[in-house]
Design a protein with these regions (language model features):
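Generic hydrophobic, aliphatic-rich segments that mediate packing or membrane embedding
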Residues: 53, 83, 107-111, 139
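Short secondary-structure junctions and interdomain/linker hinges
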Residues: 64-71, 94, 98, 122
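A structured, charge-rich N-terminal accessory region that forms the first stable segment of a protein
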Residues: 2-86
Length: 152
């Protein structure tokens, strides 16, 4: 690809304040150079530190839910806080613990954070950008990402 036409949208400067890599020496025994990276949320006082995770997700909610264009327009008009409120409203409300699909959208924003932060796979489109009703749980792909494979 050479020149980068896209850049990542994820604000990931706090990624390693939230996640710690689990080091290992295991191999996947595949013919190519694939590797397995594992992470866990940092632990503070023998408990997972969810506060830092929530902050990381909140820093990225508008970039995940809305397109680059919508984020740029809101930024130029200094209306990012309005866009943040709108983004939060897009998340599906959990009705009860048996609610099908509850919490799935949090998994989607986590996936987005990992893909952009660790793989430099840039978001082209998220499923959230296509939603027309916040109570709907849309099944299927969580998003479309562009990953440039570099042959070693």
């Amino acid at each position: 690809m050479g020149d980068k036409m896209l850049s990542k949208t994820c604000r990931d400067e706090n990624f390693f304040k939230v996640f710690k890599e689990l080091k290992h020496s295991q191999s996947l025994n595949l013919p190519n150079n694939n590797k397995l990276e594992m992470y866990y949320t940092k632990i503070m006082n023998n408990k997972f530190d969810y506060t830092a995770l929530i902050e990381l997700l909140c820093e990225n909610i508008t970039n995940y839910v809305f397109s680059r264009k919508e984020n740029l327009e809101a930024s130029e008009k200094r209306k990012i806080s309005n866009l943040t409120i709108k983004a939060i409203k897009e998340f599906r409300k959990i009705k009860n613990e048996d609610d099908n699909g509850s919490g799935g959208e949090l998994g989607e924003i986590l996936l987005y954070t990992f893909l952009e932060s660790r793989l430099n796979a840039f978001k082209l489109l998220s499923k959230m950008e296509l939603k027309t009703n916040s109570s709907d749980y849309i099944k299927g792909a969580d998003g479309i990402y562009l990953y440039e494979y570099e042959d070693e």
